[in-house]
Amino acid sequence: MTADPPPPARHAARAGSFDAVAAQYAANRPSYPPALLDAVEELAGRPLSGAKAVDVGAGTGIASTLLHARGADVLAVEPGAGMAAEFRRALPHIPLVRGNGNALPLADATADLITYAQAWHWTDPARSVPEALRVLRPDGALALWWNTNALDVDWIAEAAGRAGRFLGIDIAAEQRKAGERVEQADPSGRLDFTRRTVRWSRRVPIGTHLANIATHSALLITPEERTAAFLEQERAHLLEVFPDGMVEETYDVLLIVARTP
Protein backbone atom coordinates (compact mmCIF):
# COMPACT_ATOMS: atom_id res chain seq x y z
CA MET A 1 0.00 0.00 0.00
CA THR A 2 0.99 3.63 -0.31
CA ALA A 3 2.13 5.27 2.90
CA ASP A 4 0.44 8.40 4.14
CA PRO A 5 2.63 11.44 4.87
CA PRO A 6 4.49 10.87 8.13
CA PRO A 7 3.03 12.48 11.25
CA PRO A 8 4.95 15.50 12.60
CA ALA A 9 6.92 13.53 15.21
CA ARG A 10 8.05 10.95 12.66
CA HIS A 11 8.88 13.66 10.12
CA ALA A 12 11.00 15.45 12.73
CA ALA A 13 12.74 12.19 13.66
CA ARG A 14 13.60 11.53 10.02
CA ALA A 15 14.78 15.11 9.48
CA GLY A 16 17.12 14.89 12.47
CA SER A 17 18.37 11.37 11.79
CA PHE A 18 21.27 12.37 9.55
CA ASP A 19 23.46 13.97 12.21
CA ALA A 20 24.54 10.63 13.67
CA VAL A 21 25.76 9.37 10.27
CA ALA A 22 27.20 12.57 8.81
CA ALA A 23 30.58 11.07 7.88
CA GLN A 24 28.94 8.05 6.26
CA TYR A 25 26.59 10.38 4.40
CA ALA A 26 29.47 12.48 3.07
CA ALA A 27 31.44 9.43 1.95
CA ASN A 28 28.67 7.53 0.18
CA ARG A 29 25.82 9.76 -1.00
CA PRO A 30 25.83 10.53 -4.74
CA SER A 31 26.83 13.95 -5.99
CA TYR A 32 25.27 15.67 -9.03
CA PRO A 33 26.39 15.83 -12.67
CA PRO A 34 27.88 18.90 -14.39
CA ALA A 35 24.79 19.03 -16.63
CA LEU A 36 22.69 19.87 -13.58
CA LEU A 37 24.77 22.96 -12.83
CA ASP A 38 24.52 23.93 -16.51
CA ALA A 39 20.73 23.69 -16.25
CA VAL A 40 20.70 25.78 -13.06
CA GLU A 41 22.64 28.52 -14.84
CA GLU A 42 20.33 28.38 -17.85
CA LEU A 43 17.09 28.50 -15.87
CA ALA A 44 18.40 31.08 -13.39
CA GLY A 45 19.43 33.29 -16.30
CA ARG A 46 22.93 33.94 -15.00
CA PRO A 47 26.29 32.22 -14.55
CA LEU A 48 27.18 30.72 -11.21
CA SER A 49 30.57 32.39 -11.34
CA GLY A 50 30.41 35.48 -9.14
CA ALA A 51 26.89 34.75 -7.90
CA LYS A 52 26.11 35.05 -4.20
CA ALA A 53 24.65 31.58 -3.61
CA VAL A 54 22.98 30.42 -0.41
CA ASP A 55 22.85 26.62 -0.15
CA VAL A 56 20.13 25.78 2.38
CA GLY A 57 20.03 22.39 4.06
CA ALA A 58 23.60 22.09 2.88
CA GLY A 59 24.24 18.89 4.80
CA THR A 60 27.83 17.77 4.43
CA GLY A 61 28.41 20.10 1.48
CA ILE A 62 27.80 17.98 -1.61
CA ALA A 63 26.06 20.77 -3.54
CA SER A 64 28.06 23.57 -1.90
CA THR A 65 31.25 21.98 -3.23
CA LEU A 66 29.92 22.00 -6.79
CA LEU A 67 28.63 25.56 -6.58
CA HIS A 68 31.96 26.77 -5.20
CA ALA A 69 33.84 24.95 -7.97
CA ARG A 70 31.73 26.87 -10.52
CA GLY A 71 32.89 30.15 -9.01
CA ALA A 72 29.89 30.98 -6.84
CA ASP A 73 30.37 32.85 -3.57
CA VAL A 74 28.69 30.21 -1.39
CA LEU A 75 27.17 30.58 2.05
CA ALA A 76 25.87 27.31 3.48
CA VAL A 77 22.92 27.09 5.89
CA GLU A 78 22.49 23.83 7.83
CA PRO A 79 20.28 23.05 10.86
CA GLY A 80 21.93 19.82 12.01
CA ALA A 81 24.90 19.90 14.39
CA GLY A 82 26.43 16.67 13.09
CA MET A 83 26.06 17.57 9.45
CA ALA A 84 27.39 21.08 10.06
CA ALA A 85 30.44 19.69 11.87
CA GLU A 86 31.21 17.36 8.96
CA PHE A 87 30.77 20.25 6.52
CA ARG A 88 33.16 22.47 8.45
CA ARG A 89 35.71 19.65 8.74
CA ALA A 90 35.72 18.96 5.00
CA LEU A 91 35.10 22.48 3.66
CA PRO A 92 36.69 25.04 5.99
CA HIS A 93 36.96 27.50 3.09
CA ILE A 94 33.16 27.74 2.65
CA PRO A 95 31.31 29.69 5.37
CA LEU A 96 28.41 27.98 7.11
CA VAL A 97 25.75 29.29 9.48
CA ARG A 98 23.31 27.22 11.50
CA GLY A 99 19.69 27.69 10.52
CA ASN A 100 16.88 26.39 8.34
CA GLY A 101 14.81 27.50 5.40
CA ASN A 102 11.74 28.34 7.46
CA ALA A 103 13.62 31.18 9.18
CA LEU A 104 16.77 32.04 7.27
CA PRO A 105 19.39 33.79 9.44
CA LEU A 106 20.17 36.21 6.61
CA ALA A 107 19.49 39.83 5.73
CA ASP A 108 16.99 40.92 3.10
CA ALA A 109 18.01 41.00 -0.58
CA THR A 110 21.46 39.49 -0.09
CA ALA A 111 21.45 36.45 -2.42
CA ASP A 112 21.45 36.01 -6.19
CA LEU A 113 20.62 32.32 -5.90
CA ILE A 114 19.16 30.10 -3.19
CA THR A 115 19.59 26.35 -3.63
CA TYR A 116 18.05 23.37 -1.88
CA ALA A 117 19.72 20.10 -2.87
CA GLN A 118 17.71 17.15 -1.57
CA ALA A 119 16.33 19.43 1.16
CA TRP A 120 13.20 21.42 0.25
CA HIS A 121 10.88 18.62 1.43
CA TRP A 122 12.10 19.21 5.01
CA THR A 123 10.72 22.76 4.95
CA ASP A 124 7.23 24.22 5.31
CA PRO A 125 6.67 26.05 1.99
CA ALA A 126 4.23 28.43 3.67
CA ARG A 127 7.30 29.75 5.51
CA SER A 128 10.25 28.83 3.30
CA VAL A 129 8.87 30.47 0.14
CA PRO A 130 8.42 33.92 1.78
CA GLU A 131 11.85 33.54 3.39
CA ALA A 132 13.46 32.78 0.04
CA LEU A 133 11.76 35.76 -1.56
CA ARG A 134 12.88 37.98 1.31
CA VAL A 135 16.53 36.99 0.99
CA LEU A 136 16.74 36.93 -2.81
CA ARG A 137 17.72 40.04 -4.70
CA PRO A 138 15.68 41.30 -7.67
CA ASP A 139 16.30 38.95 -10.62
CA GLY A 140 17.39 36.25 -8.17
CA ALA A 141 16.42 32.60 -8.45
CA LEU A 142 15.37 29.71 -6.24
CA ALA A 143 16.64 26.29 -7.41
CA LEU A 144 15.43 23.02 -5.89
CA TRP A 145 16.65 19.59 -6.91
CA TRP A 146 16.55 15.93 -5.94
CA ASN A 147 18.38 12.80 -7.05
CA THR A 148 15.64 10.22 -7.69
CA ASN A 149 15.99 6.55 -8.59
CA ALA A 150 15.61 5.72 -12.29
CA LEU A 151 12.80 3.22 -11.82
CA ASP A 152 12.72 2.32 -15.53
CA VAL A 153 16.01 0.45 -14.96
CA ASP A 154 15.02 -3.13 -14.13
CA TRP A 155 17.39 -3.84 -11.25
CA ILE A 156 16.59 -0.49 -9.62
CA ALA A 157 12.85 -1.12 -9.84
CA GLU A 158 13.33 -4.57 -8.31
CA ALA A 159 15.49 -3.17 -5.50
CA ALA A 160 12.91 -0.44 -4.85
CA GLY A 161 10.24 -3.12 -4.59
CA ARG A 162 12.25 -5.03 -1.99
CA ALA A 163 12.94 -1.86 0.00
CA GLY A 164 9.29 -0.91 -0.18
CA ARG A 165 8.16 -4.27 1.16
CA PHE A 166 10.69 -3.99 3.98
CA LEU A 167 9.54 -0.47 4.91
CA GLY A 168 5.86 -1.09 4.26
CA ILE A 169 5.52 1.51 1.51
CA ASP A 170 5.09 1.64 -2.26
CA ILE A 171 8.31 3.38 -3.29
CA ALA A 172 7.27 3.85 -6.92
CA ALA A 173 4.06 5.54 -5.80
CA GLU A 174 5.97 7.63 -3.27
CA GLN A 175 8.36 8.76 -6.00
CA ARG A 176 5.45 9.72 -8.25
CA LYS A 177 3.96 11.66 -5.34
CA ALA A 178 7.33 13.35 -4.84
CA GLY A 179 7.12 14.55 -8.43
CA GLU A 180 3.68 15.96 -7.72
CA ARG A 181 5.00 17.69 -4.60
CA VAL A 182 7.75 19.28 -6.66
CA GLU A 183 5.15 20.69 -9.02
CA GLN A 184 3.39 22.10 -5.96
CA ALA A 185 6.56 23.34 -4.26
CA ASP A 186 4.94 26.74 -3.77
CA PRO A 187 1.29 26.24 -2.75
CA SER A 188 0.81 30.02 -2.68
CA GLY A 189 1.46 30.23 -6.42
CA ARG A 190 3.81 33.18 -6.06
CA LEU A 191 6.61 31.41 -7.92
CA ASP A 192 6.61 30.15 -11.50
CA PHE A 193 8.85 27.08 -11.56
CA THR A 194 10.43 25.63 -14.68
CA ARG A 195 11.15 21.91 -14.50
CA ARG A 196 14.08 19.95 -15.94
CA THR A 197 15.21 16.33 -15.53
CA VAL A 198 18.86 15.31 -15.85
CA ARG A 199 19.81 11.63 -16.01
CA TRP A 200 23.21 10.46 -14.89
CA SER A 201 24.91 7.43 -13.38
CA ARG A 202 27.86 6.41 -11.26
CA ARG A 203 29.65 3.08 -10.84
CA VAL A 204 30.48 2.25 -7.22
CA PRO A 205 31.41 -0.79 -5.12
CA ILE A 206 28.50 -2.67 -3.57
CA GLY A 207 29.69 -1.53 -0.14
CA THR A 208 29.34 2.12 -1.17
CA HIS A 209 25.91 1.48 -2.64
CA LEU A 210 24.69 -0.20 0.55
CA ALA A 211 26.23 2.49 2.75
CA ASN A 212 24.40 5.10 0.68
CA ILE A 213 21.09 3.28 1.15
CA ALA A 214 21.75 3.09 4.89
CA THR A 215 21.88 6.90 5.14
CA HIS A 216 18.28 7.35 4.01
CA SER A 217 16.05 8.60 6.78
CA ALA A 218 13.45 5.81 6.57
CA LEU A 219 16.19 3.28 7.34
CA LEU A 220 17.93 5.48 9.90
CA ILE A 221 14.86 5.42 12.13
CA THR A 222 14.40 1.64 11.69
CA PRO A 223 15.91 -0.62 14.39
CA GLU A 224 19.56 -1.29 13.56
CA GLU A 225 19.27 -5.09 13.62
CA ARG A 226 16.44 -5.06 11.07
CA THR A 227 18.29 -2.63 8.83
CA ALA A 228 21.50 -4.68 8.99
CA ALA A 229 19.63 -7.85 8.02
CA PHE A 230 17.92 -6.09 5.13
CA LEU A 231 21.23 -4.72 3.82
CA GLU A 232 22.83 -8.17 3.92
CA GLN A 233 19.95 -9.56 1.90
CA GLU A 234 20.38 -6.70 -0.55
CA ARG A 235 24.07 -7.52 -0.90
CA ALA A 236 23.17 -11.05 -1.99
CA HIS A 237 20.60 -9.80 -4.52
CA LEU A 238 23.02 -7.25 -5.94
CA LEU A 239 25.82 -9.77 -6.39
CA GLU A 240 23.50 -11.75 -8.65
CA VAL A 241 23.13 -8.68 -10.89
CA PHE A 242 26.67 -7.31 -10.48
CA PRO A 243 28.96 -10.33 -9.91
CA ASP A 244 32.06 -8.12 -10.17
CA GLY A 245 30.86 -6.20 -7.09
CA MET A 246 30.50 -2.87 -8.92
CA VAL A 247 27.02 -1.33 -9.02
CA GLU A 248 25.84 0.96 -11.83
CA GLU A 249 23.52 3.43 -10.08
CA THR A 250 21.29 5.52 -12.36
CA TYR A 251 19.56 8.68 -11.20
CA ASP A 252 17.15 11.22 -12.60
CA VAL A 253 17.84 14.60 -11.02
CA LEU A 254 14.56 16.47 -10.76
CA LEU A 255 15.28 20.21 -10.94
CA ILE A 256 12.88 23.13 -10.63
CA VAL A 257 13.93 26.77 -10.79
CA ALA A 258 11.91 29.95 -10.27
CA ARG A 259 13.12 33.51 -10.73
CA THR A 260 11.92 36.16 -8.34
CA PRO A 261 8.66 37.71 -9.54
Q: Which residues are covered by each model-predicted region?
A:
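A short acidic, Gly/Pro-enriched loop at the edge of an enzyme's catalytic core
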Residues: 102-114
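A structural alpha-helix within SAM-dependent methyltransferase catalytic domains
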Residues: 41, 65-68, 129, 133
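Class I SAM-dependent methyltransferase SAM/SAH-binding core
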Residues: 52-54, 59-103
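A short SAM/SAH-binding and catalytic strip from SAM-dependent methyltransferases
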Residues: 112-126
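Conserved catalytic/acceptor-binding region of the Class I
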Residues: 127-203
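Conserved class I S-adenosyl-L-methionine
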Residues: 1-49, 83
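Nucleotide donor/acceptor-binding cores
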Residues: 50-51, 109
